[in-house]
A protein has these predicted regions:
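Membrane-anchoring hydrophobic helices of lipid-metabolizing enzymes
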Residues: 1-81
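Non-catalytic C-terminal accessory region of glycerolipid acyltransferases
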Residues: 3, 7, 140-273
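Catalytic core of membrane glycerolipid acyltransferases/transacylases, capturing the structured
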Residues: 31-50, 59, 75-136
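Short acidic-hydrophobic, aromatic-tinged amphipathic segments that line or gate anion-handling sites
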Residues: 66, 129-132, 224
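A short acidic, often aromatic-flanked loop/helix-cap motif at beta-alpha or helix-coil junctions
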Residues: 71-75, 115, 136-140, 222-228
Length: 273
């Protein structure tokens, strides 16, 4: 890689991380000590993030283009949803927040991410959930928490990366079943979102960030199956997972932002039975 491009990547990486962390740290140090109610803390931190993320992306010269936001708006007014997206970069959550900035997104992350000293505290304050990936007990507790909070009036706008981790090359990895099991058991629609272009700009475990364009396409929702018996649910979940994964497999290259999404990515909303 040419020396000038390496320097550019470091400079823009500093701009991205520096702005984002500075705003969030100032929020924690100055504002949060005088606020004690968790709901107020979440409100302040989320709005600080919505201010910081566009500024950080602009400083790094990363443009985010979005389509299909109306699908999220419609579901937000009803029973909520589980937003799924492919995952290749730390830019992915920022791009989602930039496009869906008026939606209170609750990200579901690896539990170890929320145990990091400063970052984890910030993410928990934003309302993120941490789930142990390989623990059925932890997943069951998370499902019960979602259902209990829904009964109390909470409309879940959950964000899950069903690959379970970031891709090393930007291309799709196999989906895990847990996301779709949660959708079936909680009767929540799946909202597919295709993110393109983040890996070449800011790859996995990379500090450098290069100027470029990210595209976020929100697609029509997939309705969950109806009420099922214990014997039927696994087949229905497998069908839901297969349908969702086919949307992403239809995209020729997740590292390229040019062109519209092909069918079946743009198929109309339908239920899985």
């Amino acid at each position: 890689m040419p020396f000038g491009r390496r320097v550019s990547g470091i400079v823009h990486g500093l701009a991205l991380g520096g702005v984002l962390y500075s705003v969030m740290v100032v929020t924690f140090v100055i504002v949060l000590p005088v606020i004690w109610r968790p709901v107020w803390v979440r409100w302040v931190v989320r709005r600080a993030a919505r201010v910081a993320i566009p500024i950080a992306l602009a400083g790094a010269r990363v443009r985010v283009r979005g389509t299909g936001v109306e699908y999220a708006r419609e579901l937000e007014r009803g029973r909520g949803y589980i937003l799924i997206a492919n995952h290749a970069s730390n830019l992915d959550p920022m791009a989602l927040i930039k496009v869906l900035g008026r939606v209170d997104l609750a990200f579901v992350a690896k539990a170890e991410t929320l145990r990091r000293p400063l970052l984890g505290h910030m993410l928990r304050a934003c309302g993120w959930f941490g789930v142990e990936r390989e623990s059925p007990i932890a997943f069951k507790r998370f499902q019960e928490e979602v259902q209990a909070r829904r009964k109390a009036g909470w409309i879940p706008n959950l964000v899950v990366f069903p690959e379970g981790t970031r891709s090393t090359d930007g291309q799709l990895q196999p989906f895990r079943m847990g996301t779709f099991l949660l959708a079936a058991r909680c009767r929540l629609p799946i909202l597919p979102v295709v993110i393109r272009g983040t890996s070449p700009i800011h790859g996995r475990n990379a500090f450098a960030c290069y100027p470029g364009t990210v595209r976020v396409d929100v697609l029509p929702p997939i309705e969950p199956p109806g009420k099922l018996s214990a014997a039927e649910i696994l087949d229905a979940v497998a069908a839901l997972q297969k349908k969702a994964e086919a949307i992403y497999r239809a995209v020729p290259d997740l590292n390229r932002v040019d062109g519209d999404l092909p069918s079946p990515a743009l198929a109309p909303s339908e239920s899985v039975s």
